[in-house]
């Protein structure tokens, strides 16, 4: 625990202003049994396109925030100005996790298919744990373009969800694939940071191939931005 303003609390429940966007509508502590538990974040690391981590092979995806890895600038062979580092995410995102599908999972092209992949549904806790380090809490992927609605309908409630096949570190066999969409409350797009430190506003109508190319550190894609 740490002491802030005379109050003792867990470090994980500390509000870090740098991690939060002023537009976030739920800039609030997450509670557990009425007690401070976690605090959310609005900036997730680039975990690549879809594949995140294979525990059996200890292999990782092509993003810049990788499980059990530290990357040097030299690893970003696509160029630091052409590679995403951080992107906006919404706090308290609903998601599915731990479907535990074995083997390779093809990257889906239709957002409406995501909920059918299954798993344990959590209605409002994605991107609420800045200390967690797993894709659905502290990252984003470029499976879909920014602010794409990934629908899951329960009765009259439509959720805009994320999905991760397996929490990193929870299985030695099931790989982590993740559709964790970059989202914001800004009209028309999301704020991002590239590996050279520059800040860019990426529009929601960016082409998917370009968006995905920006998320690979060594994909050698050739693309032109609008």
Show which residues each predicted segment covers.
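Internal low-complexity, small-residue/proline-rich segments
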Residues: 1-226
């Amino acid at each position: 625990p740490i002491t802030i303003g005379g109050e003792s609390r867990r470090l994980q429940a500390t509000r870090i202003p740098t991690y939060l966007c002023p537009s976030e509508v739920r800039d609030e502590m997450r509670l557990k049994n009425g007690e401070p538990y976690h605090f959310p974040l609005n900036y997730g690391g680039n975990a690549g396109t879809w594949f995140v981590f294979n525990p059996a092979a200890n292999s990782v995806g092509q993003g810049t925030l990788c499980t059990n890895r530290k990357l040097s600038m030299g690893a970003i062979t696509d160029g630091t100005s052409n590679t995403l580092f951080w992107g906006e995410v919404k706090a308290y995102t609903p998601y599915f996790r731990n479907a535990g599908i074995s083997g390779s999972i093809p990257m889906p092209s239709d957002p409406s298919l995501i909920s059918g992949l299954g798993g344990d549904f959590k209605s409002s806790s994605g991107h609420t744990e800045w200390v967690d380090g797993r894709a659905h809490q502290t990252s984003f992927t470029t499976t879909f373009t920014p602010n794409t609605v990934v629908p899951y309908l329960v009765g009259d409630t439509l959720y805009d969800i994320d999905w991760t096949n397996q929490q990193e570190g929870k299985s030695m066999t099931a790989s982590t694939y993740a559709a964790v969409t970059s989202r914001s409350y800004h009209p028309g797009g999301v704020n991002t940071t590239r590996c050279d430190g520059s800040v860019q506003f990426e529009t929601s109508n960016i082409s998917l191939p370009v968006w995905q190319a920006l998320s690979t550190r060594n994909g050698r894609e050739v693309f032109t931005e609008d």
